[in-house]
Amino acid sequence: MSHWVVAIFCMILAVRPALADDRANLIGTWKLAGGEIEFQDTGERRPLYATDRVGYIIFTREGRMMGIIEGDERKAPQTDEDRARLLRTMVAYSGLYRLEGDKWVTAVDVAWNPAWIGTDQVRFYKLEGDRLVVNSAWAPSTNFPGKIVRVYITWTRVK
């Protein structure tokens, strides 16, 4: 029995530095390199936004994540429909984040969509040098009512 306790203790000690290393490697600014959205019901994957997508995600030493993605030929609005389209062609939120193995969880305290405030947003990630590869958990889509989707995003480190 004591061998199992020692083995588990050693595994915990090995994992803690790895999480600390990931946190140190996440800190900084990342620029959007690409993204896709996948629909659960059909398996269809399509570009996150068709054109002109831009975005950044920032992780601070203090444990805050801030992210914004825009896309699809955004222009200054002239009508209410234009204003609604601007809301549909962006995502922006921020909050304190924590690492849990291969995912980070953001406790959202400000967001472009008030429904996200007070929620935990879960993102699975993999660091590949200066690339951050991310996918979300399955969730209801804000842009495709009645659809369950997940998003795949690749970021590159800003130097």
Predicted regions, residues:
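Bacterial N-terminal signal peptides
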Residues: 4-16
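Lipid interaction determinants
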Residues: 16-159
